[in-house]
Regions:
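Acidic, metal-coordinating catalytic cores used for nucleic-acid/nucleotide bond scission
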Residues: 46-47, 144-147
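Short linear X-Pro dipeptides
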Residues: 111-113, 149-150, 157
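Amphipathic alpha-helical interaction segments
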Residues: 121, 150-151
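Short coil/turn segments at secondary-structure boundaries
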Residues: 137-142
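Accessory nucleic-acid engagement/destabilization modules that flank
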Residues: 154-163
Length: 163
């Protein structure tokens, strides 16, 4: 149902968080994608937290009442063509609070996977899981300020010793 990847670039206050949460819910509800297989990346921890909280809030509201389901259904189907809406109707989705409670449960249970994350934390996780594939011989670690200074000193000494 939902095709391809999506990149959202826009100024503050233009609805990026709402759009990402909508896309996340659509992938789970319409395509059956598990939350740990969806990646939403942003630049700041605050933005990642905002996306996650918006997703939880929308799912919680839909899980709490039929009115919440109706609101969420309108949000999810907004801007779809009539053909796309008919295709979604053909999926026979149970538009009930229980359906959204199940999605909410899945998102909460998958929070440790970090599918909503900052770019740097996502890349660090990739490199940490596959160091050899990225050309590292040893495990990768994040350095604190002192560790960073020590590493720079070692690198400088190594360069000076070669010259």
């Amino acid at each position: 149902m939902i095709e391809g990847n999506l990149l959202i670039r826009a100024s503050a206050g233009t609805g990026k968080t709402f759009s990402l949460a909508t896309r996340f819910i659509r992938l789970m509800l319409f395509d059956g994608v598990e939350p740990e297989r969806i990646v939403a990346l942003t630049f700041s921890r605050a933005a990642a937290q905002e996306i996650y909280e918006a997703l939880l809030k929308r799912l919680w509201k839909a899980a709490a009442s039929a009115e919440g389901v109706a609101t969420e259904r309108r949000n999810l189907l907004k801007n779809f063509s009539e053909d796309k809406k008919r295709a979604i109707d053909a999926l026979k989705i149970a538009w009930t609070p229980a359906t959204f409670a199940d999605l909410l449960r899945k998102v909460v249970n998958a929070q440790h996977t970090g599918s909503i994350a900052t770019l740097d934390s996502f890349i660090l996780r990739l490199v940490g899981n596959f160091p050899l594939e990225f050309g590292f011989q040893n495990a990768v670690e994040v350095l604190d300020t002192k560790g960073e200074m020590d590493a720079l000193d070692r690198a400088k000494r190594a360069v000076l010793e070669r010259t």
